[in-house]
Amino acid sequence: MASAHIEHKLSLLPDLPGSYQMKDINGKIIYVGKAKNLKNRVRSYFKSSHDGKVAAMVSQVADFDFIVTSTDKEAFLLEITLIQKYQPYYNIKLKKGTGYPYIKITHERDPKIEITGTIRKDGGYYFGPYPNVYAAQETMHFIQKVYPLRRCNGYQGRPCLYYHMGQCLGACFRTVPEKEYTDQIERIKRFLNGNVGKAKASLTAKMERAAKNLQFERAAEIRDQLHYIEQTLEKQKIISHDNTTRDLFNFYMDKGWISIQVFFIRQARLMKRESRLFPVVNTAKEEFESFILQFYSRRNNVKPREVLVPAGLDNKVLADILEIPVRTPQRGEKRDLMALAAKNSQIKLEDKFRLMELDNRTTIGAMKELMAALNLPMGHVAEAFDHSHIQGADPVSAMVQFVDGQPAKNNYRKYKLDADKTHNGADEAANTREVIRRRYTRLLKERAPLPDLILMDGGEIEMNAAKDVLENELNLDIPVAGMVKNNKHKTAALLFGNADQLINLDPKSQGFYLLERIQDEVHRFAITFHRQLHAKNSLASRLEGIKGVGPKTRLKLLRKFKTINKIKEAPLEDIQELGISKKVAQALKLSLTAEPTPARRV
């Protein structure tokens, strides 16, 4: 039986072609498939009976994801690419021995064209993968006839049979000029990249002549060659024929949330996709541009040769900061890929909204399961806390409240921490003690109801700090549990009890799903508040209101000084070296020296 989480996601699947990825409890992809209709195909795994390896695979599925494509064939090729990248356990088990061909031009003094199942870094040209082995072979044979290279085994002192048939340039008996090979390879590359107009026109004319001369078998053979070429070289939105490494970004915004898709194009294929969903604090344009810039500050994200973005962004500023070209596709395959990323962004966000609506209708019993897992009597109210800061700067905490499994948003609270006065903002224990002290001291003073359970995002440091304040300062007996995440930053388990016992919940249970929602919600709420506060103190924000400091000047200041304090401490001469007048430089330092209005404590 499918978990509530999977049941909800099944109800949101679109009636569109695409590739789906089954994941285990750790978020690892264990199976990749394709579908003409994602809704029907994915639902069949959980709504029909299976046996053998398929049943074993389904029993391991804790979640799934999908990527929408424009055609069935794109779904097929995307499936191939993802299988080759992730090597999912059950694809290997279910499809052992299955390979997908590439057409290759070898990197040799006398190159040849061949079919291969493996890409190697050997200097050769690779085209594919192709979904139809027979069609790829027929196309290769056609190329050998029309654009011959070497078809023999090399020099043997006399012309080979293929040379007499016009299918070999003659490496068998002569030294073929390198330019002759280079020109021929360029023709083949154009042909395999889809520029087949001349070849098809020539074949069509030959087919018509053969039919006119009553050579019907020859005409049928040429007709089949045309069919194979069209089938093999059909242009794909997913498989780019340009080997430039690219990252493609697009987004969709609605109801205060932004959904971002990142397509990683490597070796002429979509190698990976990342999705992000988060609430919008500024405009969609500002959030999107900020996301792109922060994306490449992450340790594992290597910059590509080119970044593609939708229209409406400041491409020049992005390119200057990233130091790589940032372009907006205007036509052709890249524009189609951009539209596909936008479509996936929209589907992802609309799915989230529908899932949230379903969540609110299916939380009965979830709180009971959660309390039972902790061996506690039935409770109704849970309050969860999370902290947010950037290396200790602008530290904040946030609290969300859930009543009978439903978010009680009127009771959410934000806390601007006094870290600068009392402790380091990166001290999680001190942050926890402060927010717990403030929250429950106030409830005691107001004689307000206390929660049945407190959840701390983090681990034993946060949990024990909260228990210390409650028990030793406020004399309160409220159960406290720590919400633990795995290495993929996903909800994994609870810490609870005097011995900090790790409690693993059934990931398919309503209780686990409620815990996951609470953890995601408090994290979202804390991050949103921190962004709002940090924006007030950020360099870019402070610079925007200063007369004479326009976008270009802001960019220069950002790149040279990085922080407000460095500008404050810089001599006027250093600022003027950027082409800024003395009057503007003085106004800049005066404005930045003035303290911003303090935020009201909640």
Swiss-Prot record:
Every GIY-YIG domain range: 15-92
Species assigned in the record: Lacticaseibacillus paracasei (strain ATCC 334 / BCRC 17002 / CCUG 31169 / CIP 107868 / KCTC 3260 / NRRL B-441) (Lactobacillus paracasei)
GO annotation terms (biological process): nucleotide-excision repair; SOS response
Domain UVR: 197-232
Family classification: Belongs to the UvrC family.
Location of this chain's protein in the cell: Cytoplasm
Domain of life assignment: Bacteria
Disulfide bond annotation, renumbered to this chain: none
Gene: uvrC
Name assigned to this protein: UvrABC system protein C
Biological role stated in the UniProt entry: The UvrABC repair system catalyzes the recognition and processing of DNA lesions. UvrC both incises the 5' and 3' sides of the lesion. The N-terminal half is responsible for the 3' incision and the C-terminal half is responsible for the 5' incision.
Main location: cytoplasm
